[in-house]
Swiss-Prot record:
The lineage of its organism: Eukaryota, Fungi, Dikarya, Ascomycota, Taphrinomycotina. Residues 1-99 are annotated as: Disordered. It comes from Schizosaccharomyces pombe (strain 972 / ATCC 24843) (Fission yeast). Residues 19-29 have a biased composition (Polar residues). This is Uncharacterized protein C569.09.
Amino acid sequence: MSDFPPSYQQHENDRMVPQESSTSNNASEFNVPKKSNRRLSVVQQDESVLNREFDDLTPEVGFDADKWERKTKHPNPQKPFDFKRKPEKKYHSKSDVGF
């Protein structure tokens, strides 16, 4: 029980239950922490971490950059792909009675 804050007691199911307070009925009895200053951490502030480029990363073994460019590059960027629609198949329900 010494691991928990003094305003909490350990329940049988190992969850923290607030003790009843007879002096106040507001949210302060639950010891709700105040909003902390939400600044970015040191790692998030470091622009070198945020602005890493693909070229700076270590490539995989056997990675061929030219082959990757050929596979991922659109053949004609001005004209988007035109996907052909297949006609929808008509399924009949087994409960339908054909006359």
